[in-house]
């Protein structure tokens, strides 16, 4: 149920941003440019203690429990299409995740990781994406 609410909230937020950008400007969550990576099933639970599933990502520890809305970065630092909506339930093991420069998207296998990485590296954007973190707890 929480996942459905999170996805619905993300879709509503995305539609609102694109169709009423001036209405939303005062309360819009910070849009961050981050490097995106992908990881496959490790056979371990996430930092928050759950088993990973599609829609889970890793980021800095203080972001656990938040939802990340991830957009493609286009040349000229323009926002592209929605890549996905992810629940931050893990921290990742790289220094970039720990320091807040990387979002690490969970994929069920290495082939899916490669497809994800191909998508974020297209158009010469070097794996950079735009991310908004929203609080969906409570």
What are these regions (language model features)?
Residues 23-138:
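Solvent-exposed, well-ordered loop and adjacent helix/strand elements within mature globular domains
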Residues 15-22:
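C-terminal segment of classical bacterial N-terminal signal peptides
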Residues 10-12, 72:
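Short intrinsically disordered, low-complexity segments
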Residues 1-10:
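N-terminal Sec-pathway targeting helices
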């Amino acid at each position: 149920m929480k996942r459905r609410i999170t996805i619905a909230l993300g879709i509503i937020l995305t539609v609102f941003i694109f169709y009423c950008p001036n209405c939303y400007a005062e309360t819009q969550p910070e849009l961050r440019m981050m490097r995106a990576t992908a990881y496959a099933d490790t056979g371990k639970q996430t930092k928050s203690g759950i088993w990973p599933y599609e829609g889970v990502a890793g980021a800095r520890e203080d972001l656990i429990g938040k939802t990340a809305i991830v957009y493609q970065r286009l040349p000229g630092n323009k926002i592209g299409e929605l890549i996905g909506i992810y629940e931050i339930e893990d921290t990742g093991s790289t220094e970039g995740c720990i320091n807040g420069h990387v979002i690490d998207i969970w994929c069920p296998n290495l082939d899916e990781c490669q497809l994800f990485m191909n998508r974020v590296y297209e158009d010469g954007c070097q794996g950079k994406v735009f991310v908004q973190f929203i609080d969906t707890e409570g």
